[in-house]
Regions:
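Subset of outer-membrane beta-barrel
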Residues: 1-207
Length: 207
């Protein structure tokens, strides 16, 4: 962030639109999907020594519906449905510091929130058989930290930059529900630390 000068203010927004045609043996369907990719801004706080950046970025999105109807012989007719919806979004803010002429140190704090629900339903046309449904819900509401370190050196018309980032792994909770009767919803389990973001580390060099 500190690479921007004292007169710089950057604002960036991006979106996407996807039009898709799906087809199988039973027919075709056209779908249009759009998404806000990110909104970010960046500006210096004090000359070229301290700079700030913030933004909103969707992290992931889920959206699908599949159905299948079949029968077991001529006596039992059933349908299966698979649904998924939701997503995660992260809001971040970051500071960077030029601690000397050739070293910069920075950190981003991310607030990630959202939920993803995936369900499976088996239903029968015969009233003597109960509908069975299972729903998995993953909810995230947590903070993450990512650190960065950068070394740079300039001589004449040449500049070499060496950088690295690190983020420790973060664990989240997961809830699972199962519905056995069409009118009864039972919580089977709530699992702590059942999902985690992996440790992140990386580096790069530019000339």
């Amino acid at each position: 962030y500190t690479a921007c000068d004292s007169m710089t203010f950057m604002f960036d927004i991006a979106g996407s639109l996807l039009y898709t045609n799906y087809g199988d043996a039973f027919g075709t369907r056209n779908r249009a999907n759009g998404n806000l990719e990110y909104v970010t801004l960046q500006f210096p706080i004090w000359r070229r020594y301290i700079a700030f950046s913030a933004g909103v970025m969707p992290y992931s999105a889920v959206g699908y519906t599949f159905t299948l109807a079949d029968s077991l012989g001529s006596d039992y007719h059933y349908s299966m449905a698979y649904n998924g919806e939701g997503g995660f979004t992260q809001v971040y803010g970051g500071l960077s510091f030029n601690i000397c002429d050739w070293v910069a140190l920075g950190a981003n704090i991310y607030y990630m929130f959202g939920s993803i629900t995936q369900s499976r339903t088996l239903s029968f046309t015969e009233s003597s058989l109960n509908t069975v449904a299972q729903s998995d819900n993953l909810t995230i509401n947590s903070l993450r930290l990512r650190y960065g370190l950068q070394f740079f050196h300039t001589w004449g018309n040449h500049t070499v930059v060496l950088g690295g980032v690190f983020e420790n792994r973060q664990r989240f909770s997961r809830s699972e529900y199962m519905q056995v009767e069409t009118t009864t919803l039972d919580t089977v389990s709530t699992l702590s630390n059942a999902f985690e973001m992996p440790m992140v580390y990386g580096g790069g060099i530019s000339y």
